[in-house]
Amino acid sequence: MMKKIVLLFSLAGALLLTACGPREIPAKGDFTVRVFDDTPVRFAPDIYPEAYNAPGADSIYHLVNGRIILKKITLPEYERNVFVKLKVTIASNGDRWDKSGSCFVLPKESGINLLNIAKGEKQFPEVDSTKLEHMVGIVAGEDYKPTVELMRFMTPFGVGHFSAPDDSLTHNRKPVYIDHWEDSVSWEQDITDLYPLLEGGAYVGIFIDTWTTEGYIASMTVDVDESGLAYDPLTRRHVEPLMNTVYYEGQTYPDIFARRDVSTDFEIPAGVRNVRLKYIVTGHGGHSGGDEFVEKRNIVSIDGKEVLNFIPWRSDCASFRRFNPATGVWLKERLASYIAKDGYSEKKVEEPLGSSDLSRSNWCPGSDVMPEEILLTDIAPGKHTFTVSIPEATEIDGNKLNHWLVSAYLVWEK
């Protein structure tokens, strides 16, 4: 009898401890969605004659004559913490040039977006031309939030389509230090901060600035890894879009920074923490002396106080050579040291220099672009102004298409 009483008390104590301790959060498991699988991205008005082209059996929308692919995905609504990874793979389907690319998500809280604009149901809000000129859609407006970039990338010169060893264009362009041309290029980024825009249902897409009917083929995967801890509650975050100058649809090359700073207002609610700014930027203008090839300082301010002051620049572009079979090549003469039969010697040699090797404004042909992240430790609740300044940016001049692709958003924890 005594043993039964002791057992009952032990069981009751265990139940009491369990009730008072952390609640075990039910697991939903890891999740992977293959959004696109070798899907063409191209300028094909004969195939996609409208700004909006309805999806077929693959559920993929083709916007702006095929230069945007868009699809609705559904992710589980997790209760445990998650790690979210995005993978994008690109190969040329015949376009040999380097092109700007953007993988993006349409903000659910925005009543106006790229999809319903393409359908003709909505249009970008009007802008104050004294501040934004004709640059519609780059900052928030009535019932509108800018498109949020999941990943910025740049296509290489002709990877895939021109990668065969016997390709007539490229077979003699491979430098001695490359054993083969790659068939595609892939990038992975941690996009956990952007999970609030994806959970439940969301429209995600890929834009490539191609003007050829061949274009590219693109694949995209979102992987969600759930925490294995029984009590690891999901960190509740909010994403606030601030700016996006990528010219997705009915927009123009953004050379506005050559003439003025660009500002937009936002509001920080009370009680939030760990407020961070994500800033993505690339400079363009592929002619000699263009903004693509000249270092230009970027200054980012909030309420007139600098939070980021830097020169966005990549000097490692030669490391992407194997992804650029169709790049233009020049011969550069230099004095080279080498090992001769009787020891070290020197002589003049001509070495190939690929266009893809040249340093650029925060990108290389075949690279992705990582966001700059700034922790805003002292920001207070209330209204604020976000400003981007590129003082030495150059205007478009005929076919000298200088412009800067800038996107920015805030992330905070609730």
What is each PLM-predicted segment?
Residues 1-28:
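Bacterial Sec-dependent N-terminal signal peptides
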Residues 20-414:
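Extracellular/secretory-pathway and virion-surface proteins
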